[in-house]
Amino acid sequence: MPVDPAKLAALQKKSGAQSGGKGTPRRPGKKVAGRNISEDEKKLSATLKKFNAQEITGISEVNMFKEDGTVLHFPKVHVEGSVASNTFAISGPSQQKDIAELIPDILPQMGQDALLQLQQAAVQFSKLQEQAKKTAGGPDAAKEAGDDEIPNLVENFEDNVE
């Protein structure tokens, strides 16, 4: 079987370091990019122990309001916190919901200040929705801009060229 010396030289350059044989150091294996969830939880619990975080009982659910009008809802929540270091960890299954879905459940739990903030957020959210409809380029937006009508050609422009 004939061996092409040019191909052999190219393969030797590609191989770089020797991967085996007597007296050669072994290469370390590549680590997998995907991480295990249990490893992350172990690191988190170790960090919380450093902060001397204690489990906070009596919290049945947590709602985090986002700027885009959605809510991150934790129905079954586990809360740990350290008041001294101002650190709190919220864990558990989460769901992303719209504000309108949660308002009947949230209103009895809120205070006066929170209700005012919620009203402001609702007004701001409705303004954002109106702006999105105008910029979406729907049929109503085109009629308002006057771009819907195309003018008819009255003359033949080729006659004017001659």
From Swiss-Prot:
Q: Which GO terms describe its biological process?
A: protein transport
Q: Which UniProt keywords apply?
A: Cytoplasm, Nucleus, Protein transport, Repressor, Transcription, Transcription regulation, Transport
Region (Disordered) location:
1-39, 130-162
Q: Where this protein primarily resides, as one coarse class?
A: cytoplasm
Q: Where is the NAC-A/B domain?
A: 38-103
| Name of this protein | Nascent polypeptide-associated complex subunit beta
Function per UniProt? Component of the nascent polypeptide-associated complex (NAC), a dynamic component of the ribosomal exit tunnel, protecting the emerging polypeptides from interaction with other cytoplasmic proteins to ensure appropriate nascent protein targeting. The NAC complex also promotes mitochondrial protein import by enhancing productive ribosome interactions with the outer mitochondrial membrane and blocks the inappropriate interaction of ribosomes translating non-secretory nascent polypeptides with translocation sites in the membrane of the endoplasmic reticulum.
